[in-house]
Amino acid sequence: MRKPRFLAPWKDSPTKPALYHCISRVVDRRFILNDSQRENFRKFLRIQENFSGCRVLSYCLMSNHFHLLLEIPPFPANGLTDQELLHRLNATYSEPFVATIAKELTEARKQNHETHAAEIHARFTHRMHDLSQFMKTLLQRFTQWFNRTHQRTGTLWEERFKSLIVQ
């Protein structure tokens, strides 16, 4: 059984962000990431950064592994406004999907169904400001793109990502 990931003891602090050095290697340590693939990885990295609220402070993309320095800020104490949520959703979802969510939120607010509006927010915000969710989504999306592009199946990464607390 896997040991739980060690997260910063202050990860639930309302003010202090956590910094992590994250590393992941390609399966069999094969040298498969060329310049265009690394550019696509950067694209997925920025998409996930814009959605999640996590900040990529630095990165190094190699042919068979990568290093990320991530800042995981605390979730805003008052949550996200509807506009902030929709802005983040635009980073990763299609315009028609975001328009549907915007319509749902508008209807819920008009009818004073705050519980329903909170449920809509919760469908997405549980994946924000979270190290594991950030890395899971980044690695999954890049793997799906890579596998589709190279007509392959299966895992692309050697094992689960490693993370070290920096601060």
Q: What are the language-model segments listed below?
A:
Residues 1-167:
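Short catalytic/metal-binding and nucleic-acid-binding patches
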